[in-house]
Each structure stands twice: as C-alpha cells, then as structure tokens.
Amino acid sequence: MKVYSLIIGVILSGFYSSFAQDNKAVAVVSATSCEAICKANTSKKALLLQSIANKSNENKTKSTDGMVWVAAGEFKMGTTDYPDAQPVHDVSVKGFWMDQHEVTNAQFEAFVKATNYVTIAERPLNPEDYPGVPVENLVPGSAVFSPPTDKVSLGNIQQWWKYVPGANWKHPSGPESTIVGFENNPVVQISYLDAQAYAKWAGKRLPTEAEWEFAARAGRAHTKYYWGQDLKPDGKWVANIFQGTFPNNNTAEDGFVGAAPVQSFPKNPYGIYDLEGNVWEWCSDLYRDDYYKNTTKVNPQGPLDSYDPEESGVEKHVQRGGSYLCSDEYCIRYVAGSRGKGETTSACNHLGFRCVKDAE
C-alpha cells in the first residue's frame, strides 16, 4: 500500500538514493540508481505481458540482425570498490548474441505499433494504491532529471529529481518533449516489465548480470573502468557521462548533456557500443546485496528472490553501466564491476535496456 507522502503535488519517495554522494568509490551506496517514485497498477501485469510478448513473429524470433556474437569465456566479476559487488569472483558464461547498441526509440516504437503495448509510466494509477491522495493528483507520469540552477547540497536528491505527469517513453522529459528527431537515441522511461515485454516480442531476452559484465569487459584485464585505467584515455572522453559540477552544471565536454544517439562513442573490442554511460540498462537478475557471496560460478542467473536491506519487501532487478548522470564526483557507477538496482516497475529518463539471444 502506498503512502500519502508519495504524492504532494509531485510524487516523491526515497527514489534514486544510489545517487547519494559517493565521497569515495568504496562508500556504501544507499539504494538504487533508479528507484520508483510512482507505481502503476500492475495487478494484471503477468497476463498482460504474456499476451503482448506472444505477438512475436517467427522471422523476428530467428533474426540476429544488429547483434554481436559473444563467445563463451571466463572472467573475474565484481569490484572491490562497492560492498554489493564483492567478492570479486571467477565466473564463466556460455556464448550468446548481444544487441550492438541499446534499444532505440525507433525500435521500441515498432514494438508498440505491432502490439499496442502500454508502458507502466502510461498506465492509470490505482487510487487503492495511494490512500488519502486526491484522485485528481493521480496522473500517470514518471521521474525526470530536473537540474537546479545553482549548486546544491548532494544530500537531497529531490532537489534534482521531479515526478512529471505525462512523462513516458514518447515524452521522456514530460508532455512537451518528444522523440521525434531522436529516433536513434536509446529509449528511456522503461521499467523492467516494459523491457521484458519488448525482449520477448523480439525473440530475445534481457541479459544476465554476468553476461552483461562479461560483454562490457570484452576480454580486457580487471581495469578500473571497462575501457581501461584512465578516465580520459589519450585525453578523450570515450563514454557519455557527466562532466562539470553535479547536478547543476553539466559542461558536456563529451558533446552531450543528456542521452547520446547510440554508437556515438567508440565500440569495445567485441564490437558493442555504450555498455558504459549513456543510459542505465536492465539485467534479468533479481537484486540481492549479498548475492556475490553465494553465487554459482557457471552461467549465474541471479538469486531466487530479491532483497535490499535498505528497502526490504520491494522487488528489485539489477541495472548496469551507469548513465549520462554519473560523474567522478557523484554516482561513479561506470566503474567496472559496479552494480545498480531498481524496483521492477520503476522508470526514469536515464534508464533503458538492450537484449541478448541464446545460440540456436
């Protein structure tokens, strides 16, 4: 049951608490990179998602167009920089196909046109979930990064995150925004359930956390960043992350204030783009902060249940890669091996996904 504090003109919560300041990379990050501030009525979600996903077609199911083959291999997974990514441990994965880039607005639009799918952020809110909240305030929407004009303390994320009625994948920053002209940008305002529905329709699936990190490391040593030891190798930005003073002054030294069109930065040795920065990406694994202490080493699929000690009782899935809002002074989640987490129905304007596919 939701509480009244979720909606006070805008809907607020402990949302995005993993953006709490990382004074040191080893600091305990307080919560998720993209927590829900608004939960749509999903009581029928299982049946709805299944009916949508079943509209996949045979040709799409068999196609690996736009994907890269990632051969089986072993690697060291995790990082000592964050408690929930420890211990660093040996993992092996079988070969799989991975989307060369994040799912774009154009690709997601094709899915919606084919299936009439309605994302979580677009669905009406159930008054029963928000007792005491006036019905007129229960307007579908989502979380939008809204930077303050001046420098602020980093202790209160509500200074730069706002619930915006009408924000969804077609209108990422609110009703006045559009994806027209941004068809090649990664689709955002996507919940785990939305990503899962698209993946099944496309004859694919979401990557496991192990597959995602294996592809991001791309055979490279256990470096600080996926691309190497230096934040700016040879003085060049190689990922879309935040430069300047967070959250009010993004100097956009890498050429982008928000999300960049896919393939704007160099591909990794496996031929895959934007596995670090740009937008967070959903993985199939449920999130547990202690999972690495008990995980299997061969093709790990994630824990059987979700548990976050900072928000027990809330089902969360793993997110990976960081986004254009991660900087070297705040939310350094482009550090190789680091993890994010998000409530299953959460969405925001720096969260997207890509898909993988098993070998035939």
Question: Residues of each region from the PLM?
Answer:
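Short, compositionally biased
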Residues: 3-4, 18-176, 193, 218, ...
